[in-house]
Amino acid sequence: MNFQEAWEKQPMSKPRIEKVTVNMGVGESGDKLLTAEKVVSEITGQKPVRTLAKQTNPAFNIRKKLPIGLKITLRGKKAEEFLKDAFTAFTASGKQLFTYSFDKRGNFSFGIPEHIDFPNQKYDPSVGIYGMDICVTFEKPGYSVKRRKAKRANIPAKHLVSKEEAINYIETIYGIKVEQE
């Protein structure tokens, strides 16, 4: 199955990136969370949202509803530009993307252990090193039918993004080799 020919023949079948979600679990609030906010906003160009602890854990000195992490959702051109930088950092850390990182709808996740692997980031001893998880969600044109308020309809199975399509898209657009399990 050649996806490139199918995408040229039918442009509505070509997948696109719906959103890129960046998650950073700091594990504690205070100064460490504030510096992590600065780091992640510098990398992404957007202000992060704080995530709260779901339960109390006295061993780690965490109380329920205490901010302990950050998340940012990127869409459109910002998401594509960030993903290029993220793949640069991912390959710089010597990691590989495997097929088991993709779900059946083509969405995938990967982690970056050190933020200093990103372009234009330097190590600062006062800041430290932060890692992050990056989740990429795919869709095809026409998904607004599923989200709209009036005359909402389901997307047929043939129009959903498959795992193979997403892998092919990542390999052709970003030049990342996806390894078999």
From Swiss-Prot:
Keywords: Ribonucleoprotein, Ribosomal protein, RNA-binding, rRNA-binding, tRNA-binding. GO terms for cellular component: ribonucleoprotein complex; ribosome. InterPro entries: Ribosomal_uL5, Ribosomal_uL5_arc, Ribosomal_uL5_C, Ribosomal_uL5_CS, Ribosomal_uL5_dom_sf, Ribosomal_uL5_N. Belongs to the universal ribosomal protein uL5 family. The keyword Repeat does not apply. One of its GO terms (molecular function) is tRNA binding. The gene is rpl5. GO terms for biological process: translation. The keyword Ion transport does not apply. It comes from the Archaea. It comes from Methanococcus aeolicus (strain ATCC BAA-1280 / DSM 17508 / OCM 812 / Nankai-3). Part of the 50S ribosomal subunit; contacts the 5S rRNA and probably tRNA. Forms a bridge to the 30S subunit in the 70S ribosome. This is Large ribosomal subunit protein uL5. This is one of the proteins that bind and probably mediate the attachment of the 5S RNA into the large ribosomal subunit, where it forms part of the central protuberance. In the 70S ribosome it contacts protein S13 of the 30S subunit (bridge B1b), connecting the 2 subunits; this bridge is implicated in subunit movement. May contact the P site tRNA; the 5S rRNA and some of its associated proteins might help stabilize positioning of ribosome-bound tRNAs.
